[in-house]
Amino acid sequence: MSDKATIYDIAKKLNISAATVSRALNDHPKTSNKTKILVQETALELGYEQNKLALALKSGRSNTIGVIVPRIDINFFGSIIRGIEDELYPKGYHIIICQTHDNEQKEIQNINALLNAQVDGIITSITKNTKDVSIFERILDKNTPLIFVDRKLNLKGASSVTLDDFKGAYQATQHLIDQGCKRITHLTVIGYQSVGIYKDRLEGYTQALKDNDIPFDADLILDIENDINGGKKAGQKILNFKDRPDGNFFFE
C-alpha cells in the first residue's frame, strides 16, 4: 500500500511551496482563486486527505457539533437530530451523534469522547439517571457551548430548548374535563418519574383535576415500560378497570 499523499507532494507537483498549498487548502483570503482551484484539483488527483483533528487543534475549530440523545430509534429524538442537521449543514457544520440508552456512565463516556474530538459545541438530552453534573460543568469550563434539549439540568452558562410540559399537560387534562370526563388516566414511564418533563406533566395533570374539584386517584396513574409492549399492557389495564376510565392522557 502506498503512503498517503502530503502537502509536500502537492507542492512538488505544482512547483510551489508547502506553505502556499496549506493556505490554499485552508481557503486563505490572500491566496488567489486560481491557485486554490489548482491545489484542490491536484489534492484530489493525488488522493490527499486533510487531517481534520490536526486542523482543529491548529485553528481551534472543528466545524463539528456533538449531539447526545437517549436513543436514535425513538421518533422524537430522530426528528430532533434531523432538525439540528438541517440547520447546521448549510452553515458548514457536521454532527457527531451519540446514544446513551439512558445510561449515565455511557453519557459521561460520550461527553469525554466529544471533548477529545474538539467539537465546537454539544447538544444533549440527559439520561433518566443523570445525577452527577460535574461532567457538564467540565464542558462549560472548557468554554464549549452546551445546549440541553427536552431534558435538562439547570446550569449557569448552559442554554436549553424545552416545552412547557406543565402547561401542555394541564391543557390536555382540562380538555378532557371539558368533554365531561372525570376518571382520567395518566401514563408515566417507569424509572422516569424524577425526570423534569415527566414530573411537570404529572403536576399539570394533577393541578387540572384540583382546579375542577376532581379528586386525585393514584390508581389512575399508570406506570409503563417505554416500549410498544408497555402501551399494550396499559391498554389492557384500562379495559380491566371495574370502574372504567372515561378519559386518557397519554404522550409519546
Residue ranges and their predicted role:
Residues 130-140:
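Active-site-adjacent beta->alpha loops and helix N-cap segments on the catalytic face
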Residues 45, 86-91, 112-115, 140-148, ...:
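Bacterial carbohydrate/catabolite-sensing allosteric modules
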Residues 46-121, 190-192, 202-206, 210, ...:
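Amphipathic helical "hinge" segments at domain boundaries
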Residues 1-63, 76:
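N-terminal helix-turn-helix DNA-binding module of bacterial transcription factors
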Residues 101-104, 127-131:
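Short beta->alpha connector loops
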